[in-house]
UniProtKB/Swiss-Prot annotation:
Family per similarity comment: Belongs to the pseudouridine synthase RluA family.
Subunit structure: In late stage pre-50S ribosomal subunit interacts with ObgE and DarP(YjgA).
Root EC class: isomerase
Main location, first listed in the record: cytoplasm
Gene: rluD
Origin species: Escherichia coli (strain K12)
Keywords, alphabetical: Cytoplasm, Isomerase, Ribosome biogenesis, RNA-binding, rRNA processing, rRNA-binding
Reactions mediated catalytically: uridine(1911/1915/1917) in 23S rRNA = pseudouridine(1911/1915/1917) in 23S rRNA
Protein name: Ribosomal large subunit pseudouridine synthase D
EC number: 5.4.99.23
Cellular localization per UniProt: Cytoplasm
Length: 326
């Protein structure tokens, strides 16, 4: 059942020169800018009695604005008592350190048991924020830092910051193969043409940029630090596979685990049982959506990646004399 929304207000003189969608988002902070933009495009907004369907239209101040729209009720998700590792929290945002095996948002095959369900239980008022305040996602088996908005204004500003590339997200990963130097992958990404749950580099895809640098070399693997400029689905995993260095353990874009010649049983066992992509969101930096203060958080790599790196490091030290690239 749809909820009717009827709003009226006068544009402030202080908003002179702002885009219409920006001005309305400030005037009606209970509604996200993306929702207001949809209403404008759907011709649900009157400015001085006339329909305005251009979100980029500049306001002069003093205009009379009326909105007559409907909101379809979002699917009701159940609060669930799922533990959350809270790294930081204030009245506007929550920073969580997501574990493996936890989906961020309910969807096909995962109707519940997600970060969203956990947030609804942890902080019930977040039900009034679209998508329970979730601003960006991590894959089910990618671990690490995420920001969640506790209010609509905080979410609106975080989404805008993400679009302006003002939020910095850095990851640690272990890739297959010996990489000689860092670099940048600037390749567009879209849905795979035949495998609809997969993503792929495609010339008609959306722009995607990943920067990477080498942290540590092993015999036939490389530990990396990566930074996202964009945030496409599976971006790091797709980009690294594209340059023939897929992530260790990646069940979709990786290959079979191939331990180096002469590897110990501990190495082989650890590699074979590592059943997720070796990827962790280790650093998050952003400007606080309300105060504007720059803030930064770090999350150490989880134990499974620690063990993986330790056996690779021990193997490298044992066979250093056999490595031909030193």
């Amino acid at each position: 059942m749809a909820q009717r929304v009827q709003l009226t207000a006068t544009v402030s003189e202080n908003q002179l020169g702002q885009r219409l969608d920006q001005a309305l988002a400030e005037m009606f902070p209970d509604y996200s800018r993306s929702r207001i933009k949809e209403w404008i495009l759907d011709q649900r907004v009157l400015v001085n009695g006339k329909v305005c369907d251009k979100p980029k239209e500049k306001v002069l101040g003093g205009e009379q604005v009326a909105i007559n729209a409907e909101i379809e009720e979002e699917a009701r998700f159940e609060p669930q008592d799922i533990p959350l590792d809270i790294v930081y929290e204030d009245e506007d945002i929550i920073i969580i350190n997501k574990p493996r095996d936890l989906v961020v948002h309910p969807g096909a095959g995962n109707p519940d048991g997600t970060v969203l369900n956990a947030l609804l239980h942890y902080y019930p008022p977040i039900a009034d924020v679209p998508r329970a305040g979730i601003v960006h996602r991590l894959d089910k088996d990618t671990t690490g830092l995420m920001v969640v908005a506790k209010t609509v204004p905080a979410q609106t500003r975080l989404v805008e910051s993400l679009q302006r590339r003002e939020i910095t997200r850095e990851y640690e990963a272990v890739a297959i193969g010996h990489m000689t130097a860092g670099g940048t992958v600037d390749e567009p990404i879209s849905r795979h043409p035949t495998k609809r749950t997969h993503m792929a580099v495609h010339p008609m895809g959306k722009p995607a940029v990943t920067h990477y640098r080498i942290m540590e070399h092993f015999r036939v693997h490389t530990r990396l630090r990566l930074r996202l400029e964009t945030g496409r689905t599976h971006q790091i995993r797709v980009h690294m596979a594209h340059i023939t260095h897929p992530l260790v353990g990646d069940p979709v874009y990786g290959g079979r685990p191939r331990p180096p010649k002469g590897a110990s049983e501990a190495f082989i066992s650890t590699l074979r049982k590592f059943d997720r992509q070796a990827l962790h969101a280790t650093m998050l930096r952003l400007y606080h959506p309300i105060s504007g203060i720059e803030m930064e958080w770090h999350a150490p790599i989880p134990q499974d990646m620690v063990e993986l790196i330790e056996v690779m490091r021990a193997d490298f030290e044992e066979h250093k004399d056999e490595v031909d690239w030193l």
